[in-house]
């Protein structure tokens, strides 16, 4: 039987919306909404990986699991890697990178991602969708460059994540 862990990178240092993970939505922090979505999949253990004591405390004080990482990580992927190494869990086959700022994510999408990761033997997976033209120049939207088209129920390898795209002349 395969084992999956869901790791949720989260930090307070966002310049566009400071303290975003701790903002309340219907009396619950954004990060706890995301954590609960991960837990409700029942596909494996869920941890929030953070370099901020405030986020760690928020999750743990609401009966969640969190792990403190270095604050200096440049990407969520780096934070997840450190958290996974610190946890030192045995027999984990797959890691789901669940974005910490997606409180409205559909639980079925997370489950489907896990199933696709297992089917394709992809050790780490994160969700992405086709980008609408109106978001191409929006620096608030992270873009992913893949080795193929992004389609529903299809897996594609991420080559890079970026906020701005250099346009060809």
Question: Which residues are covered by each model-predicted region?
Answer:
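N-terminal glycine-rich phosphate-binding loop and ensuing alpha1 helix
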Residues: 2-50
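Short beta-strand segments
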Residues: 9, 97-99, 127-128, 162
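Active-site donor-binding loop signature of nucleotide-sugar glycosyltransferases
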Residues: 27, 69-71, 100, 146, ...
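Short, high-confidence coil segments that cap the C-terminus of an alpha-helix
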Residues: 43, 89-92, 119-123
């Amino acid at each position: 039987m395969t084992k999956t862990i869901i790791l949720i990178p989260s930090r307070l240092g966002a310049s566009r919306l400071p303290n975003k993970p701790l903002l309340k939505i219907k009396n619950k922090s954004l990060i706890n909404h995301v954590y609960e979505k991960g837990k409700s999949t029942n596909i494996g253990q869920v941890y929030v990986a953070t370099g901020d004591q405030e986020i760690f405390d928020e999750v743990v004080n609401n009966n969640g699991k969190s792990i403190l990482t270095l604050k200096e990580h440049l990407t969520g992927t780096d934070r997840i890697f450190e958290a996974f190494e610190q946890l030192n869990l045995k027999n984990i086959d797959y890691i789901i990178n669940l974005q910490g700022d997606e409180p409205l994510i559909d639980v079925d999408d997370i489950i489907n991602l896990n199933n696709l990761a297992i089917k394709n033997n992809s050790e780490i997976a994160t969700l992405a969708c086709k980008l609408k033209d109106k978001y191409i120049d929006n620096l608030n939207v992270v873009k992913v460059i893949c080795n193929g088209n992004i389609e529903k129920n299809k897996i594609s390898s991420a080559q890079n994540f970026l906020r701005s795209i250099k346009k060809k002349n």
